[in-house]
Regions:
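NAD(P)+-binding Rossmann beta1-loop-alpha1 motif at the extreme N-terminus of oxidoreductases
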Residues: 1-53, 57, 78-79, 115
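Rossmann-fold dinucleotide-binding core
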Residues: 58, 67, 87-166
Length: 203
């Protein structure tokens, strides 16, 4: 089955390449096609015409809404759209509701792992959507990543990503505050690092 991939930037391009390496035929689209000349590219209408599974990796919710506004009316019913962008929950729910009107399933599946994870196929996918659609897409997640978790219905993937990022942010703030306190107490940072690395403060 030919897979569509919209958004071939720092994350999208290596994800698409891993699908190609696994033997899948892929048709891509990006606003800067010269950056990924090794991936066959065409237009959004062509992708909608030829692909029943279309993955996107876009920079923000506004871009997602604009792309899906063009894409959804062009897709055949039963097409599955898989958005791996990190966007706001409201945008994820909006495109899901619009797609549902056309009998098209949307899965929100933001990732964790960064560019290295995208290149190595070790991403974690936080997935929101219907289980039937997830079951069809899970084998592709397994190619692009090491783990995928169905977190709930539409929008649940983006909700999980926000919570994950909150934990990361709070942890970073805690580490910074601890080292700031160490400096005020004239405690050597390297010695504190050695202690924390093998103690309960390790995170």
């Amino acid at each position: 089955m030919k897979i569509g991939f919209i958004g071939l930037g720092n994350m999208g391009a290596p994800m698409a390449r891993n699908l190609i390496k696994a033997g899948h035929e892929l048709l891509g689209f990006d606003v800067a096609p010269t950056n990924v000349g090794d991936i066959t590219q065409d237009s959004i209408p062509k992708i909608a015409e030829e692909c029943r599974i279309i993955i996107s990796m876009l920079p923000d919710g506004n871009v997602l809404r604009n792309v899906y506004e063009e894409l959804i009316p062009l897709c055949t019913p039963k097409t599955i759209l898989v958005d791996c962008s990190t966007v706001d929950v409201e945008s994820a729910l909006h495109v899901s509701k619009e797609a549902e009107k056309n009998s098209i399933a949307v899965i929100d599946a933001p990732v964790s792992g960064g560019v290295v994870g995208a290149e190595n196929g070790t991403l974690t996918f936080m997935v929101g959507g219907e289980k039937d659609a997830y079951d069809q897409i899970e084998p592709y997640f397994a190619i692009m990543g090491q783990k995928s978790v169905l977190c709930g219905g539409p929008g649940a993937g983006q909700s999980a990503k926000i919570c994950n990022n909150m934990i990361l942010g709070i942890s970073m703030i805690g580490v910074c505050e601890a080292f700031n306190l160490a400096q005020k107490l004239n405690l050597n940072w390297n010695r504190l690092f050695d202690v924390v690395s093998t103690s309960s403060g390790s995170c």
